[in-house]
């Protein structure tokens, strides 16, 4: 949860920070907080608030993801259990069945090369998950001071 708001998926909170608009934040809250995120709703959100994306989104998205992952770690015992179950291994965010270019940043796609299978991609999410697990739920992050949700500064963790 974030403050008084509970949501089913951390992806909702992650997407809130993409837009610099209290109206966009409230739309997400009203439309997605208690539902699973699906690609159609995400595209609707992006289209509805096109032009309101933070100018620095590409620069801050990884820092914001760290924040979101720490919240999930704090609030979700099953998530913590799953992370510790793969101790010593690097989690892979499998993007094999997706077509979004950003998924090769956050994850990796399984490819075959000369008869061997490899994951190709940056797998930033997998690396962050390993750091989160290995650091007891803490990640260093730096967010801009003007990052607000629902018109208020982001809650410190």
Residue ranges and their predicted role:
Residues 1-157:
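Charged, low-complexity intrinsically disordered segments
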């Amino acid at each position: 949860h974030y403050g008084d708001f509970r949501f089913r998926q951390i992806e909702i909170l992650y997407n809130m920070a993409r837009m610099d608009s209290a109206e966009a934040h409230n739309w997400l809250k009203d439309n997605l907080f208690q539902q699973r995120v699906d690609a159609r709703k995400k595209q609707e959100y992006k289209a509805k608030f096109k032009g309101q994306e933070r100018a620095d989104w590409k620069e801050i998205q990884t820092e914001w993801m760290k924040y979101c992952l720490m919240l999930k770690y704090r609030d979700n015992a099953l998530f913590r259990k799953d992370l510790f179950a793969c101790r010593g291994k690097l989690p892979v965010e499998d993007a094999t069945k997706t077509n979004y270019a950003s998924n090769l940043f956050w994850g990796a796609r399984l490819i075959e090369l000369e008869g061997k299978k490899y994951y190709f991609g940056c797998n930033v999410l997998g690396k962050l998950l390993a750091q989160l697990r290995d650091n007891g739920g803490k990640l260093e992050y730096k967010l801009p001071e003007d990052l607000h949700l629902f018109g208020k500064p982001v809650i410190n963790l």
